């Protein structure tokens, strides 16, 4: 049963990315997954239920990555927590590239589901990151920055490779699906945080980027 459910999820992610949610029928998903249409109704109560499952699954994993880093704040410096958090988010989205791309496309739509997502999940993300920044400022690790501007830039950098992979490959002639790209891109964001957030008069060597 778990295998059947996963086949439906994998088929839906692929089709929603290529044909769009509205352009994909339940029969399309069943055909791609090689299952009966009734299986989709049984597991997800239809296409809308499947959409909600995909979004919830993505966000539960996303928030788990952030919370795991946040829990280290008592043992690590705020700088190390931020680096760990950004690396974790990038790795999570890299490992779930198709789902990530679909999610951010849906996020651009003004729907009841997306408004609920903003309230439930992204409010938690804001809280965790804001607390880490406040901790870093209190301990003189971080500069005073506009949280709104910092988050706008950080989110843009974290999301861009997964939302526009064709642009990166076709125009910039790079390969965002390769691990090498992820490693180099992660280093670039860490260097941006060093310039933007970390106190310039404090010596700090970024943790070495691990091979992911």
PLM region descriptions:
Residues 7, 15-49, 53-54:
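Helix-turn-helix
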Residues 57, 61, 92, 96, ...:
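Phosphate/oxyanion-binding loops and surfaces in catalytic or ligand/nucleic-acid-binding neighborhoods
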Residues 49, 90-128, 149, 174-183:
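Short secondary-structure transition hinges
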Residues 4-13, 29, 54-62, 129:
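Generic hydrophobic, amphipathic alpha-helix propensity
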Residues 18, 68-99, 139, 147-154, ...:
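Hydrophobic alpha-helical connector segments
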Residues 5-6, 26, 48, 52, ...:
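Short, structured helix-loop boundary elements
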Residues 60-67, 80, 112-138, 163, ...:
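Amphipathic alpha-helical packing segments from all-alpha helical-bundle domains
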Residues 101-102, 115, 134-189, 203-212:
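Hydrophobic/aromatic-rich alpha-helical bundle segments in the mid-to-C-terminal region
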């Amino acid at each position: 049963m778990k295998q059947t459910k996963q086949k439906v999820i994998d088929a839906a992610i692929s089709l929603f990315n290529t044909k769009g949610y509205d352009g994909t029928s339940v029969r399309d998903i069943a055909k791609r997954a090689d299952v009966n249409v009734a299986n989709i109704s049984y597991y997800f109560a239809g296409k809308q239920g499947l959409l909600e499952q995909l979004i919830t699954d993505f966000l539960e994993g996303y928030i788990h990555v952030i919370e795991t880093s946040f829990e280290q704040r008592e043992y690590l410096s705020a700088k190390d927590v931020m680096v760990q958090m950004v690396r974790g988010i990038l790795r999570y989205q890299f490992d779930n590239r198709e789902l990530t791309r679909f999610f951010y496309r849906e996020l651009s739509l003004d729907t009841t589901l997306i408004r609920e997502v903003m309230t439930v999940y992204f409010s938690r993300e804001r809280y965790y990151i804001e607390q880490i920044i406040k901790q870093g400022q209190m301990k003189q690790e971080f500069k005073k920055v506009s949280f709104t501007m910092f988050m706008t830039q950080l989110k843009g950098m974290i999301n861009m490779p997964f939302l526009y992979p064709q642009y990166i490959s076709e125009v910039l002639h790079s390969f965002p699906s390769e691990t090498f790209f992820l490693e180099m891109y992660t280093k670039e964001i860490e260097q941006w945080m060093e310039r933007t957030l970390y106190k310039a008069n404090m010596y700090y060597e970024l943790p070495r980027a691990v091979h992911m």
